[in-house]
Amino acid sequence: MKRHIVALAFSFLFATSALSAQTFEEYMVMMDSLSMEPPQIQTDFHRKYKVKNLDYGMTIGIERTPGGRIWNCFVAGGDNEDAYFVLNWSDDNGKTWTDSKYVIDPHDKSLPFARRTIVGQLWTDPLGRLWLFYDQSVTYYYGSSTNWYSICENPDDENPVWSEPKFLGIGCTLNKPTVMSTGEWVLPVSIWDRNTMAYTVLKDVWTDEEFRASKAELDPVRGAHVYVSMDQGKSWTDRGMTRFPHPTFDEHIIIELGDGRWWMTGRVGIGTRNSGIIQSFSSDKGYTWSEPEIYQPHISSRHFITRLASGNLVMVRHGRFDECTKTRTNLTAFISDDDGKTWKGGLLLDDTYDISYPTGFQAPDGYIYVSYDLQRTRRGEIYLVKMTEEDILAGKIVSPEGFLKHLIYKPGKVEKSKANIAYRKANKKNKVK
């Protein structure tokens, strides 16, 4: 009820006066209030959320539960202010997938601005509970976003139940927490830089000066944060942070090294300009961090690193570990047995153009599952890889159940999307020229 009262109040406000008549301070109050309304996980939703009716696809997170179910979370709507989350699952090790099971769509036509959910992750904790982290912001990004989580205690049941969303703090979480040898749970949280703000959406209602001043109070803390829980997720504390040069969404991952240090890797740059996988180290459990430095050349895009049961690390990235591909292609997996100093093997997962955002997990039987998306606007497909360390070291699938390029999601109306139509028109125009 409170949510509807707020929505009606904003609707009335904007129905009685133009957007341009509102003050900068009033915009901030409205946007902050809209971002703080808890985004609900919906189980009873309109048929437009069925896979056959979706028109976009971007992978977010994938995770296995104690009973063997694999959950998938992806973005529908677009990589913009139209974004929302859809979840489904597989009960046969990723071979077949259900239709949409849950939706997080905070959009409301009665609101003066679009409100989206676009960043998050799935994670099974040591207690067997499935977590869903997800953010919320107004427009694409107005300089701030709120970070939330819900927990499912029965993720393998026919009708899993999610807890009410709980506010975590300002920012967003794209990659999984890490459980340290000390028992600490360590969660990466990013407060995006100002260069991601939706000026194209807000330029008609804010002056340049106001835009530059928006959410200025967050400027000193924009960057890659480390949240820590000492009580198995009951509470979280922002322990420390670092700021990357040329930041682009941060997208950081935190690994505990054999010598006890914490190793953070992240994303920087735009395209191939100032880009790479960046790294920073903490010797005091995340309170302070070394000056960030480039770890490996890499196109500006998400990478994936996690610790395996063997003690080795697996990394999935674009191209060889010593190259920066010109486009998002050649997703390749490597193994390190010396905490990331060197990498071995090299299993090419996919050499298609415009593939991105690998994320994954290791199952108890040793198989490593990684999902990624393909041409989000034009095809919107999500693929799954199942492999072992031996496959990666051999450079080919040698395990009996391993596979590459297995399609797990294809939106039914991607060709009719606004973005796809615009792309085809632009492509046709360029060919004419």
Predicted feature residues:
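Bacterial N-terminal signal peptides
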Residues: A7-S17
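Asp-box/BNR beta-propeller blade signature and adjacent active/binding-site loops
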Residues: Q22-K433
